[in-house]
UniProtKB/Swiss-Prot annotation:
Subcellular localization, as worded in the UniProt entry: Nucleus; Cytoplasm, Cytoskeleton, Spindle
InterPro entries (UniProt xref): FSCA_dom_sf (IPR034904), MIP18 (IPR039796), MIP18-like (IPR002744)
Function field: Component of the cytosolic iron-sulfur protein assembly (CIA) complex, a multiprotein complex that mediates the incorporation of iron-sulfur cluster into extramitochondrial Fe/S proteins. As a CIA complex component and in collaboration with CIAO1 and MMS19, binds to and facilitates the assembly of most cytosolic-nuclear Fe/S proteins. As part of the mitotic spindle-associated MMXD complex it plays a role in chromosome segregation, probably by facilitating iron-sulfur cluster assembly into ERCC2/XPD.
Cystine crosslinks: none
Protein name from the UniProt record: Cytosolic iron-sulfur assembly component 2B
Keywords noted in UniProt: Chromosome partition, Cytoplasm, Cytoskeleton, Nucleus
Family (UniProt): Belongs to the MIP18 family.
Entry's Gene Ontology BP terms: chromosome segregation; protein maturation
Subunit structure: Component of the CIA complex. Component of the MMXD complex, which includes CIAO1, ERCC2, CIAO2B, MMS19 and SLC25A5. Interacts with CIAO1, ERCC2 and MMS19; the interactions are direct. Interacts with KIF4A; the interaction facilitates the transfer of Fe-S clusters to KIF4A to ensure proper localization of KIF4A to the mitotic machinery. Interacts with CCDC117; the interaction is direct.
Length: 163
């Protein structure tokens, strides 16, 4: 795994994380099923996209670790903007950039191209939040990271369904 740790048998940075209960699935409304009614993208839809992303260090999802929460997602469908704040489980988490990159890739693959995305660390929750946020906001650095075969493989593992 990137930065050591991972599920490859190395030492875990946060060996005993708090585990949170998953929220229920969102009920589908009649309006959402009606193809004639425009369906705007909202915070719950974004949360549903990212909640099941796997943590790179633990066999748990970002929702189960409370790394992502619906209340920290801002969406403006008319302005085509999405902002996701995520909270690493510990202030010195070396996986923060990888987690942010995984969220960003999931959104890039799932949302229409018109959307501008801001994926960042919840303010005050990580020792290197400004450096990580700067990396995640830099389109060229994100594109270069995704050209790295090993890193892309790790991101894809985070995005794949657990068996």
């Amino acid at each position: 795994m990137v930065g050591g740790g991972g599920s490859g048998g190395g030492l875990l940075e946060n060996a005993n994380p708090l585990i949170y209960e998953r929220s229920g699935e969102r009920p589908v409304t009649a309006g959402e099923e009606d193809e004639e009614v425009p369906d705007s993208i909202d915070a719950r839809e974004i949360f549903d996209l990212i909640r099941s992303i796997n943590d790179p260090e633990h066999p748990l999802t970002l929702e189960e670790l409370n790394v992502v929460e619906q209340v920290r997602i801002q969406v403006s469908d008319p302005e085509s903007t999405v902002a996701v704040a995520f909270t690493p489980t510990i202030p010195h988490c070396s996986m923060a950039t990888l987690i942010g990159l995984s969220i960003k890739v999931k959104l890039l693959r799932s949302l229409p191209q018109r959307f501008k995305m801001d994926v960042h660390i919840t303010p005050g929750t990580h020792a290197s939040e400004h450096a990580v946020n700067k990396q995640l906001a830099d389109k060229e650095r994100v594109a270069a990271a995704l050209e790295n075969t090993h890193l892309l493989e790790v991101v894809n593992q985070c995005l794949s369904a657990r068996s």
